[in-house]
Amino acid sequence: MIQPQTLLNVADNSGARKLMCIRVIGAASNQRYARIGDVIVAVIKDAVPQMPLERSEVIRAVIVRTCKEFKCEDGIIIRYDDNAAVIIDQKGNPKGTRVFGAIAEELRELNFTKIVSLAPEVL
């Protein structure tokens, strides 16, 4: 569960390393926590030098991994080691060209198919 002020790792090669959530944009208008597949507004806290994304830039990201376990439709419970997100543009396309680490199958059902196709492993 991701809420405002939560620090997240970036799971792509867009140039950012760490994000801090500042707002949850989910299906519900006044959703308090973000889960896998929810879109958040975040600020970049740490970035790679000489890359297009810079520190203190406000961006949108989609949550791909959370430490809080979640139950799949088939009854399997999945929990990851870290909280991670992929930076997206206004249309929902990823800004990076690679995605690192495993991501959840639920992203395919939420129309983030481009992120799923870039991922090395889908659980």
Curated annotation (Swiss-Prot):
Pfam family membership, one: Ribosomal_L14
Subunit note: Part of the 50S ribosomal subunit.
PROSITE patterns: RIBOSOMAL_L14
Gene3D superfamilies from the UniProt entry: Ribosomal protein L14 (2.40.150.20)
Family indicated by similarity: Belongs to the universal ribosomal protein uL14 family.
GO molecular function, one term: large ribosomal subunit rRNA binding
Stretches assigned to coiled coil: none
Record bears the keyword Nucleotide-binding: no
GO cellular component term, pick one: cytosolic large ribosomal subunit
CDD domains associated with the record: Ribosomal_uL14
Single biological process term from Gene Ontology: translation
Biological role: Binds to 23S rRNA.
Protein name in UniProt: Large ribosomal subunit protein uL14c
Alphabetized UniProt keyword annotations: Chloroplast, Plastid, Ribonucleoprotein, Ribosomal protein, RNA-binding, rRNA-binding
Domain of life: Eukaryota
NCBIfam families: rplN_bact (TIGR01067)
Species assigned in the record: Oryza sativa subsp. indica
Cell location: Plastid, Chloroplast
